[in-house]
């Protein structure tokens, strides 16, 4: 086959969906550089104070600029960006660089640490901005295409591809128990610097925000579903605190086998507990909704709103989805007795 025939054959190949997806959304993906000024006291001074109680004056304080980098994407013509909270939280300076080379100062409008979401605003000053189209993460199925875009390790405009490996992977399973989010799992390569960048579907719509990886494995990355981000974006853009309900308990999952093992241990810290499937309350926060409702350490939650529960992550999700100042009916196993208690959720900011 001659070169002319080869060129003609190549020209007949259809443009693949990845190219189309990146052409559609890639220009709206940005690099975010951050700077944070920190003051550090010399280690020698701290050692003297710790060992001998010597408090030297004046303090030899060093000011150091910590730099960070991540990704984000523009969602409207006014310059609103979505990214991860851990990319921009506590930053003193935020610089946003577009794919076309334009550079803007960014202002952090709002941060929500519990979902690791943040909104950053740039001033387009009359310039046109590329906008990333947002998809519907509720329509995703395991096996759907997933395209990750961002700036891993400082390598701008990097594209990797995989599939949606799992839906609704709990934060606890990911290994970040302090978050209130169920993640999309993907095998599209995600690396440091990808954080805050978009995960796209085959049409180039944003279906997630790349957030985390498992350091001990390859091909396991996690993204916040875009529907979650859409539901919170208005709070963050306006600088409002995102409402997160809580009831105020510490808990562990309980099985009859685990309860029996506990009850056979004379040194058990929980005493005798019911040998049932449920969620064992290991502590109750003072002045919390749970305490006000009469919940106690050693109680076992076996149902919520007449639906059986046996996993603390499920209970946490129910509380989160219920909203603030709403009632939940908990069925409690306390010793040999079954009790119905009503708990009214409260805003987590009231926890102090």
Locations of regions flagged by a protein language model:
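C-terminal recognition in membrane/secretory proteostasis and scaffolding
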Residues: 1, 7-10, 20, 71, ...
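Chymotrypsin/trypsin-fold serine protease catalytic domain
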Residues: 151-178
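Conserved active-site neighborhood of the chymotrypsin/trypsin-like protease fold
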Residues: 12, 67-69, 74-157, 217, ...
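Residue-level recognition of beta-strand microenvironments
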Residues: 32-35, 77, 90, 109-111, ...
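Short pre-catalytic strand/loop immediately N-terminal to key active-site residues, enriched for Gly-Thr
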Residues: 130-135, 184-191
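Glycine-biased strand-turn-strand hairpin within the trypsin-fold
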Residues: 2-81, 89-91, 102, 117, ...
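Catalytic nucleophile loop of clan PA
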Residues: 73-74, 189-209
